[in-house]
Amino acid sequence: MVERTEILGLEFDNVTLDEAADRAIALMDQDGPHLVATPNPEIVQLARRDPEFGRVLSDADLVIPDGVGVVYAAKILGRPLKGRVPGIEFAAALMARMAGKGKRLFLLGAKPGVAELAAANLAVEYPGLVVCGTHDGYFQEDAPVAETIRRARADVVFVCLGAPKQEMWIARNGADTGARLLVGLGGSLDVFAGQVKRAPKAFQKLGLEWFYRLCRQPSRIGRMAKLPLFLVSAAGERLQAGRHHS
């Protein structure tokens, strides 16, 4: 059983990138559906305000810390995690393991045409990977999309609708897709399609992808301002715990 670490009300699997990918492969050999969630600080805060969303995340089979802020908060709370596991890197590690195994991947989300472009790029990057279908994120009814995924006989679905929409969609429709593993991956399809560039490696290693994105998109300042509040919440919980023990 994988060790879990509670951070501000949400339990994370304390895993490395490789451990997370191996765990996902193991889940694919069990009857599904299994939800993989990739919360960052913004998503944790959202889960604290929305009990229903919080329950869906808590029920996920694999919860990985996508966001350096989650790792910092864990240290503040005295419950250190093994490290950050970016969702985009988790997806890459999972696809590398799927390639050649005959496991089938469906891509759901983004603007029309983006998922198809991502599929073409991934087929080149991961020889042997079977992308069995795509669907954009602009749809009104869930059932036809779930049926499309079922007909494609997908083993894994990357659901890229943004949080909390993607996790709630998986909770409602996961069983109807017939897939074993469904992963909430936010804006990953835009990256796989080459529409959005990841931060340079130096920024990634330093955990400063958020700063790079802020420089590229100043309009994100409102969202980024939530990170200090998240860390303050962690510090407040640590102080409160200290008072209870004193």
Where are the predicted features?
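N-terminal nucleotide/polyanion-binding subdomain common to many enzyme families
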Residues: 1-83, 88
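A transmembrane-helix-recognition feature enriched in membrane-embedded lipid enzymes
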Residues: 3, 71-74, 98, 198-246
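Short glycine-rich anion-binding loops that position phosphate/pyrophosphate groups of nucleotides
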Residues: 40-43, 161-166, 188-189
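A short, gly/pro- and small-residue-rich
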Residues: 51, 55-59, 167-187
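Conserved acidic residues
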Residues: 61, 132, 155, 180
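Conserved beta-alpha
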Residues: 71-148, 152
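Short, flexible loop segments at boundaries between secondary-structure elements
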Residues: 136-140, 180-216
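Proline-aspartate-enriched helix->loop->beta-strand connector
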Residues: 149, 153-163, 179
